[in-house]
Amino acid sequence: MEGEERGYWRWSKRDFFPEESFQSFGSYRAALSQTCSRFKNRLVSRSDDENERFELKKQSEHEMKRCLTWWDLVWFGFGSVIGAGIFVLTGQEAHEQAGPAIVLSYVVSGLSAMLSVFCYTEFAVEIPVAGGSFAYLRIELGDFAAFITAGNILLESIVGTAAVARAWTSYFATLLNRSPNALRIKTDLSSGFNLLDPIAVVVIAASATIASISTRKTSLLNWIASAINTLVIFFVIIAGFIHADTSNLTPFLPFGPEGVFRAAAVVYFAYGGFDSIATMAEETKNPSRDIPIGLLGSMSIITVIYCLMALSLSMMQKYTDIDPNAAYSVAFQSVGMKWGKYLVALGALKGMTTVLLVGALGQARYVTHIARTHMIPPIFALVHPKTGTPINANLLVAIPSALIAFFSGLDVLASLLSISTLFIFTMMPIALLVRRYYVRQDTPRVHLIKLITCLLFVVVSSMGTSAYWGMQRKGSWIGYTVTVPFWFLGTLGIVFFVPQQRTPKVWGVPLVPWLPCLSIATNIFLMGSLGAMAFVRFGVCTLAMLLYYFLLGLHATFDMAHQQIVPRT
């Protein structure tokens, strides 16, 4: 009966598709015939703070346990970020794209990431829900924009987990004094998919299992592992500078400035894990105090650490000799510290283990909130009554991640992951500006038109700057004299002609609209620095998302919004 307590494990059709549109072939056919009108409705439909914070949480049936403090969030920041970039992508991008200037790539991507961190922090304090960027965009930019973001969040979660798990295998092999690919199974499949990785599958399964047991225990385990990893990082930095050879920094820009920005766009993945902290808001004891400390504190320290580690690697070994699969271990071996490579490999394993562990927590919470809106089946929104964790959501991310990690190489995954991350981070400052300058039923239409016009100036000029850079017209600056002034005009237009409609209650981004507009520009610029194949893969994935949306997601969310849901029995 409706309202009767049910067990967590349930597999009926109505648990996956309780919406009226899916109860029979006739009702589904009728829903498809209304696709255009339903899309128009959802395109302009926006949620609100109260709905996201209170009403949607009822879909989970049980609440998550508030057990985290700012201390936990800082270590979650370390655990989710350090490991993925430094131990996975630094060697690859230094060797192939930037050379010793990889340190500048980390500076560029770090500054851009900090701008995004500001935006995330304001939203997380104002709207402390598990959905993170998905919930924020659903409130400010509407249902369709939130869906595209949801698709990219799932893509980022699945591909990111697979990429780190593949790298885990490489470092484990190095720790055993074998080549990075020694533990993989060679096949006759096409390049990039011909090295099967069963160890990566086991690592993903273990991380998902631990994250499903208890958030508090996962936090404790992450704290211990991250502390060990931090000690290894200090060893790497100090030992790296002790064995530094400044001649390895020459030439500093072997691939030119273009290489720096291409590498920056890829190593941006190194900062992508910080958004996991925002998804912990429902489990944080004091979100308004703890989230700013956790986000801003951890990311500031991490940016400095990344730059120092990248510099130490470049000074230890010539960029042409850097091993793209296990850079630090091989670098220490090259300077005579053969024992050092084992310590570095162990630290890298610790770092990537925490990335997988914290990632499993954050990704499951994203999925939980997306499922609460019925964009994906609501069974994935359920929170287990005993563990207080979303086990079904963990499984939804872990299973496809394991399949991808089993087949796909790191180089195939990295660029696809970066463009997905950059897309989400570009949407966030746009949403923040909408939140500050537009309030439904209060903001005059003329001010809304001014805001949209100014935002178009900022976005289009940023795209123009990125495109002109991508044309590789070395020594020619005439294009920037057109695109950059338009960015300033758009930002100044917001300053002088669009009055702010909302002031943050607790913590807000400083220098609005300048910092959000700068975040838009840097993210779009970095996105444009990626290769053409990254956009092709991104386009294919986006088309797949849209196909799902128009066949399933649109009708499920329409029914949810209009309460056309069959009662659970």
Swiss-Prot record:
**According to its UniProt record, in which tissues is this protein expressed?**
Expressed in roots, stems, flowers, seeds, and leaves. Mostly present in leaf rims and cotyledons of developing seedlings.
Where is it predominantly found? membrane
Membrane topology listed for this record:
Multi-pass membrane protein
Taken from the record's topology, the Extracellular segments are 89-97, 165-192, 244-251, 312-341, 411, 472-477, 527-537
| UniProt keyword annotation of Glycosyltransferase present | no
Q: Which InterPro entries does this UniProt record tie to the protein? A: AA/rel_permease1 (IPR002293), CAT_C (IPR029485)
- Domain of life of the organism encoding this protein: Eukaryota
Q: List residues in topological domain: Cytoplasmic.
A: 1-67, 119-143, 214-222, 273-290, 363-389, 433-450, 499-505, 559-569
Pfam families given for it? AA_permease_2, AA_permease_C
Query: What pH dependence is recorded for this entry?
Result: Optimal transport of arginine at pH 5.
UniProt lists the family membership as follows: Belongs to the amino acid-polyamine-organocation (APC) superfamily. Cationic amino acid transporter (CAT) (TC 2.A.3.3) family.
* Name of this chain's protein: Cationic amino acid transporter 5
